[in-house]
Design a protein with these regions (language model features):
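Exported/periplasmic ABC-transporter solute-binding proteins
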Residues: 2-196
């Protein structure tokens, strides 16, 4: 769910004498989950970075009630964790961020925690509300809808990739072609992602 790392490209080059082939097969929006009782409706990327780095610790600092912000996130082996850290937090996560094994667990925690905030794939928001996200103070806030993610208006959207050691041939090419076909992209949508 993340772009290949430079170190992984070097290993690929050393083992197969190639940099491989990157294929974008879907889009995803990393959404911010809030408890339904939380009055906050939108946050900027900078505010989210402040919240998840521990610089912003109270909801009143971002227009909410006077209560401590409780952080939930993905485990550090997750591509979502890495993407969110690199593109939103831009530093280390706050030590009090509770890491959980999957987006469903993050959603479940936020659902039960009035002052919780979590992040994960946009498809998993049952029982919580999405928080609209703004690039900065002067921008429009966008919810992670299909339209906003597909048009790149939603600021925390990413491609999901497949990597191959070489240009696909034979049955592998047929498989890739199917994934990128109308039928394959329909399946992408059915499982909660967005078509490329």
């Amino acid at each position: 769910s993340r772009p290949i790392k430079q170190s992984e490209m070097e290993k690929l080059k050393a083992r197969y004498n190639t940099l491989g082939v990157e294929i974008a097969c879907a889009k995803d929006g990393i959404t911010l989950f809030l408890n339904n009782a939380n009055p906050v409706k939108e946050l900027t990327i900078k505010q989210l970075g402040g919240i998840y780095s521990g610089k912003i610790t109270n909801w009143k600092e971002v227009g909410g009630v006077d209560a401590s912000i409780i952080l939930y996130g993905r485990e550090n082996s997750s591509g979502t964790y890495v993407y969110f850290k690199d593109n939103v937090v831009k530093t280390d996560y706050a030590p009090n961020c509770q890491t959980l094994p999957g987006t469903a667990a993050v959603v479940n925690a936020v659902k039960k925690d009035k002052y919780g905030i979590g992040y994960g794939g946009a498809a998993y928001a049952e029982g919580v509300k999405h928080c609209a996200v703004k690039k900065d103070d002067k921008s429009i806030a966008y919810l992670p809808t299909k339209e906003n993610i597909s048009s790149n208006k939603y600021p925390i959207a990413r491609y999901l990739y497949m990597y191959l050691s070489s240009k696909p041939k034979g049955i592998m090419k047929e498989y890739i072609d199917w994934i990128l076909s109308e039928e394959g992209q329909k399946v992408v949508t059915e499982v909660g992602y967005f078509p490329v």
